[in-house]
Amino acid sequence: MLGEAVYQKFSSIAQVKATDIDLNEPWLGYADVRDYAQVLNSITEFHPDVIINLAALTDLECCERDQENSWLTNALGAENLGLIANQLDVPYVYISTASIFGGDKEAYTDFDEPNPLSCYAKSKHSGELFVRQCVRKHYVLRAGWMMGGGVKKDKKFVNKIYRQILDGKRELHVVDDKFGAPTYTVDFARGIHRLLESELYGLYNQVCGGSCSRFEVAVEFIRLLGLEGEIEIRKVSSDFFKNEYFAPRPASERLVNMKLNARGLNVMQDWKSCLKEYSVSFIQHSQGASLPAEAAEESRG
């Protein structure tokens, strides 16, 4: 998702070494952020001008089931790359999350105090704290509900909705009690580049403009697909999915890009504009796909 957008943005202007433990693209090499010695060797042989850490275990239920791996990937991995960035004296970009907040406020600025609820959020917050406290040249960017990668790579809410439609579902159940802001990966990658050019290190919220519920995202996506008369979306509470999605989630993950706005560095568009742009790839895919006949299903991200 985000890795592809960042690679496309930076490979057009610089030499990029992109790594992962899942080599699903020809431009990827292998590196495991949990293994300090291995990732140190991988990075130092390349002599980078900047290190961008996109490695994360983001499935909340997976993090609850495998808490050790969550901490090793999201916290220790962040530390390993941060130590290497200090050693090489290069800027370090760490991606944090709106999930680190407890949901007791309607919206959070860069200066609000986190209160993580889930193992995922706690491990990401731990990584964020280390980077902010120990890495000299750091950018910590807090993202919201990621959308990007299209039908092939998007593992988040928008593609979950689309996949249900492809499966022939005509009735979708979507929660209306979770609020936040989508984060379009294309704009997010542009934002990373803008910040690196600025050399204004620090912590930044970086999400799309506006606020919405999961339900509102689903309604807008269905409208953009031209399926308003074909798909029925039913509002449900989070309890509807309590067995499948059992990890604690804050009621509100809405972030405000206060610092980016104050410094004239905000490149993030309104969430509806981003969803419209992002939906083009799904519309193109649907033209070659068999869209639904009848069914009923439940959806949440």
Annotate each predicted stretch with a short phrase.
Residues 3-4:
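N-terminal Rossmann-fold NAD(P) dinucleotide-binding loop
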Residues 72, 76-80, 100-141, 145-147, ...:
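Catalytic helix-loop patch of NAD(P)-dependent Rossmann-fold dehydrogenases
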Residues 129-180, 186-187, 193:
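NAD(P)-dependent short-chain dehydrogenase/reductase
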Residues 33-73, 86:
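NAD(P)H-binding glycine-rich loop region in Rossmannoid oxidoreductase-like domains
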Residues 150-152, 178-187, 206-224, 277:
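Substrate-binding strand-loop-helix patch
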Residues 21-37:
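Rossmann-fold cofactor-recognition segment
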Residues 261, 270-301:
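Amphipathic terminal alpha-helices
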Residues 191, 198-245, 286-294:
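Mid/C-terminal beta-alpha module of Rossmann-like enzyme folds, strongest
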